[in-house]
Amino acid sequence: MTNLVRWLFSTNHKDIGTLYFIFGAIAGVMGTCFSVLIRMELARPGDQILGGNHQLYNVLITAHAFLMIFFMVMPAMIGGFGNWFVPILIGAPDMAFPRLNNISFWLLPPSLLLLLSSALVEVGSGTGWTVYPPLSGITSHSGGAVDLAIFSLHLSGVSSILGSINFITTIFNMRGPGMTMHRLPLFVWSVLVTAFLLLLSLPVLAGAITMLLTDRNFNTTFFDPAGGGDPILYQHLFWFFGHPEVYILILPGFGIISHIVSTFSRKPVFGYLGMVYAMISIGVLGFLVWAHHMFTVGLDVDTRAYFTAATMIIAVPTGIKIFSWIATMWGGSIQYKTPMLFAVGFIFLFTIGGLTGIVLANSGLDIALHDTYYVVAHFHYVLSMGAVFALFAGFYYWVGKIFGRTYPETLGQIHFWITFFGVNLTFFPMHFLGLSGMPRRIPDYPDAYAGWNALSSFGSYISVVGIRRFFVVVAITSSSGKNKRCAESPWAVEQNPTTLEWLVQSPPAFHTFGELPTIKETQGELQTRK
């Protein structure tokens, strides 16, 4: 009973972080299964495994997106790494609102159940993650499936907003003595910016899907031209949330990568303040570019010109981050342990994803590329190889601190190489498919596209083998087998202590700090003084 009480009613940031990780892993496996089903259907032209049920194909696409975004990346990045390490990194005893933290987590399992049950009601919700009306309207999806999906989004949104409030309060008010804002570790900064993005964007999504709910059930016409509404209004509202959302997914990853590159290059991050302001700029600009998802809906030409220019400007702070990571590695004595491999892979692949993003930012080109596989390739390069690689990198970097045991290095490196090969083989051919005009969200295609699709599907099977390696690593590390106990500082940062988590035992005590640590000087400040 005590164990049940410990995990059900926990107010400890580490326990809640662990719950988020377990939840994210379960949702991630489910989302991966859906993606493999999608790739099996697309492996050859014609109907393969779904027997011509094209609505079911769209339900799979929708579920895959929701699971990966709202139930895997966000819980693991913000809920998992955020809860586990933000309090430790700032020298705080716990989060500001521990019980709010608990309810933030426990809103997610019911939300997941609602999403999964929506697939079982009538024909499921085959709207794509954007849930555009009129397809999501009562005439096109007459059952309760879309309503259940909307309620699922509401719950997960409430969870995220409560979590954001908690992080903002914690970071502003609970820093240890001497831990000024300009001394905050970059991961903490990234979580802070992310929390503000969530707080400002999620209420807009909530408004949009609530209006959709009343359109479906109470005969309002917010998005129905017959009653003076406009479906384009929904798109504006959705993307005003949806674009900051993609930065919410990647920003904590930026923070994690900064820590890893610094640790394994044996030097402080190049241009710390520049990194901080770059993240803040990305956060602000993220709210000013939403309509680049809507270049094909008939926006005015000067509107399109503005959104093209604004979107390209986002590349500037992103470029500052990329070059600062490279400058951090420049001249460092680099150790290519598994976390560093994932970090370097992240930088390389995220840059490719960013380049295709610059291509899509051109409103003229986007007319041709919108809703083709080029877009799918673009956002999977920044998510499937950006956010997910950052998750893996963070896992290998901090796993000793979490479990108190070292991971098997060779298996970790095998996991990296299989996954790296698999995801590139899956998503690189999609650029060619998109340039040839293959449309997204369609379960069949002309024979001309068969070659690249076969290759892409083969790549996704390889990725699954890589992810199985990962769970082998987790199993070995978490069991008390041969792997040795983890030192306080497994990456030998004693000579170069950069952040507080390497000064506490592994795993940290239930209450991390007996007394709050006082910060005298950071490594970066020391460097500058020299």
Curated annotation (Swiss-Prot):
Binds 2 heme A groups non-covalently per subunit. Binds a copper B center. It is a multi-pass membrane protein. Coiled coil: none annotated. Cu cation binds at residues 243, 292-293. The chain crosses the membrane at residues 18-38, 66-86, 103-123, 148-168, 186-206, 237-257, 269-289, 312-332, 340-360, 379-399, 414-434, 447-467. Keywords: Calcium, Copper, Electron transport, Heme, Iron, Magnesium, Membrane, Metal-binding, Mitochondrion, Mitochondrion inner membrane, Respiratory chain, Translocase, Transmembrane, Transmembrane helix, Transport. It comes from the Eukaryota. One of its GO terms (biological process) is oxidative phosphorylation. Its main location: mitochondrion. Pfam families: COX1. It is an enzyme of class 7 (translocase). GO terms for molecular function: cytochrome-c oxidase activity; heme binding; metal ion binding. The keyword Transport applies. Ca(2+) binds at residues 41, 46, 443. Its EC number is 7.1.1.9. There is a cross-link at residues 243-247 (1'-histidyl-3'-tyrosine (His-Tyr)). Component of the cytochrome c oxidase, the last enzyme in the mitochondrial electron transport chain which drives oxidative phosphorylation. The respiratory chain contains 3 multisubunit complexes succinate dehydrogenase (complex II, CII), ubiquinol-cytochrome c oxidoreductase (cytochrome b-c1 complex, complex III, CIII) and cytochrome c oxidase (complex IV, CIV), that cooperate to transfer electrons derived from NADH and succinate to molecular oxygen, creating an electrochemical gradient over the inner membrane that drives transmembrane transport and the ATP synthase. Belongs to the heme-copper respiratory oxidase family. Component of the cytochrome c oxidase (complex IV, CIV), a multisubunit enzyme composed of a catalytic core of 3 subunits and several supernumerary subunits. The complex exists as a monomer or a dimer and forms supercomplexes (SCs) in the inner mitochondrial membrane with ubiquinol-cytochrome c oxidoreductase (cytochrome b-c1 complex, complex III, CIII). This is Cytochrome c oxidase subunit 1.
